[in-house]
Amino acid sequence: MKANSVLRSTLPNAIIAVLESRKRVKPRCGSLPQMTISDQRALHLPHMRANPFSARPIEVDGAAMLVGRKTVMQDLSLHLRFRNPRLMVLQGERGSGRTSVLHACANLSPEVLTNTMFPEQDPVATLLSELYIRIAGYEVPATTGMLVEQMVASLEGRSGDLPLITFDFPGVGGEELAQVFERLTPCLCRLKAIVVVALTPAQLAAWSEDLISSYDVTVPLPDLNAKEVRALIDARMRTVSHEGWAASDALIDEALAATGGRPAGLIRHFRDLIDAQR
């Protein structure tokens, strides 16, 4: 009992209030822990039209919710505006927000060619044909050489910001991707465009040094710190409430300890926390 009293004396009052209220509420079997009125007050939750913490990747119209990725977005914007063609690898662990970054990039260019479905058969020919259709037209040439030459000619004749071509295949192994991009890269490097391939460090590790040397590889997308977690909360809450959520430092520290600051983990953590009040 004495040890419990000492422990309780070191806890913030808000956390104690949540713990005490949960002792009095018996959760339903198979459900999230119920959150009482005192829980809600302790967490300072505002009125919300919906739960803003969705685990889906951010889409184009949700780019304002992207947090902690300012540097990579600025670099891409600069290359597109100054018409500086290049091949890039956007590197990040699973859950770091690679796909969300690529979706948000759609705001940076008037023409974005996304590739997210990996072809099961002859992926090199299929991906090149799909690119050709979107760049040059529906009558795909019979040979790869003619196909590439016509894509190059079509892009050379354009003015304005460069098109952005992205590849995002998180479910494909690094060795298989390496084989595909060994053959694709000589074609991609001739296109007057920004080409971005999203890879996990594990996928990138399977690429040869020669292949990697053709690309500008970003530093891995970092996990979020406490300041960025608060910015993430603010950005999400603005989409569903006219009020902010004054989440306590203790709550944010708890979320960081549970997730390591990985964006996908943080989103699920706060989603479940808010769902628990329903």
Each PLM stretch: what is its role?
Residues 85-102:
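Walker A/P-loop nucleotide-binding motif
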Residues 197-203:
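A short beta-strand-to-loop transition that corresponds to the Sensor-1 phosphate-sensing loop
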Residues 203-254, 271-274:
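Helix-loop-helix "sensor" segment of P-loop NTPases
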Residues 258-271:
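The conserved phosphate-sensing helix
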Residues 122-142:
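Conserved NTP-binding/hydrolysis module of P-loop NTPases
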Residues 109-121:
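Conserved catalytic segments around the Walker B and adjacent sensor/switch elements
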Residues 4-84:
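A short, basic N-terminal segment
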Residues 149-197:
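Conserved Walker B catalytic segment
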